[in-house]
C-alpha cells in the first residue's frame, strides 16, 4: 500500500472522469460531496480509486437510462468517510443481495465481466480497514457504499 494524504473530492472527480466518457447519452453521471474541497485524509489513492471505478463501471453496465450518482460524506457515518455510488438501474434482487461480494458472483450472465470486481473491492476495503456494502434499503436501483475509518492505519 502507498499511503499518503489526498483530497477526497479530487479522488472522486478523477474516478468519475475515468468512467463518465463511457456512459450512454441517456444516463447522467454526477458527483456531490459534503466534504470540504481542501479536506485531506490518508489513504492509498490507487486502491481507493480502483473501488470507486469498479462501483461506477458496474453502475454504468446496469443503467440504461436515468442517472449514476457518486457522493462523498463525512456525516453519513460519523468518524468515517463514506463513498456511495447509486444508480437508477434494475437494482439487486433481494435473494442475491447477500452474495454480490462473493467471488465469481454475476447477477446477469449476459453482461460483460468475470464476477470478481466486487470481491476485489471487498478485499481492498479490508486492507484499508474499511468495508464495502450494498445498501439493501435503497429502492431506486442499486447503491454501493465504501466506508473508511478516519483514524486507522491500513494493512500492508
Q: What spans do the regions from the language model cover?
A:
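Short conserved segment of the HATPase_c
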Residues: 92-104
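Glycine-rich ATP-binding loops of the HATPase_c
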Residues: 129-135
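Conserved micro-motifs of the catalytic ATP-binding
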Residues: 1, 40-43
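Short helix-loop "hinge" at the ATP-lid/N-box region of the Bergerat-fold HATPase_c
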Residues: 59-60
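Short beta-strand/loop element within the Bergerat-fold HATPase_c
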Residues: 67-79
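Acidic ATP/Mg2+-coordinating residue in the GHKL
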Residues: 87
Amino acid at each position: 500500500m502507498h499511503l499518503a494524504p489526498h483530497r477526497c473530492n479530487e479522488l472522486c472527480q478523477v474516478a468519475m472522469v475515468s468512467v463518465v466518457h463511457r456512459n450512454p447519452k441517456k444516463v447522467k453521471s454526477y458527483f456531490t460531496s459534503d466534504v470540504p474541497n481542501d479536506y485531506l485524509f490518508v489513504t492509498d489513492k490507487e486502491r481507493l480509486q480502483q473501488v470507486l471505478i469498479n462501483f461506477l463501471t458496474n453502475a454504468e453496465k446496469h443503467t440504461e437510462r436515468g442517472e449514476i450518482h457518486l457522493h462523498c460524506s463525512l456525516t453519513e457515518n460519523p468518524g468515517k468517510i463514506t463513498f456511495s455510488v447509486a444508480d437508477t438501474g434494475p437494482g439487486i434482487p433481494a435473494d442475491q443481495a447477500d452474495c454480490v461480494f462473493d467471488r465469481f458472483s454475476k447477477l446477469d450472465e449476459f453482461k460483460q465481466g468475470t464476477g470478481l470486481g466486487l470481491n476485489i473491492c471487498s478485499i481492498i476495503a479490508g486492507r484499508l480497514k474499511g468495508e464495502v456494502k450494498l445498501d439493501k434499503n435503497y429502492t431506486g436501483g442499486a447503491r454501493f457504499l465504501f466506508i473508511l475509518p478516519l483514524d486507522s492505519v491500513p494493512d500492508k
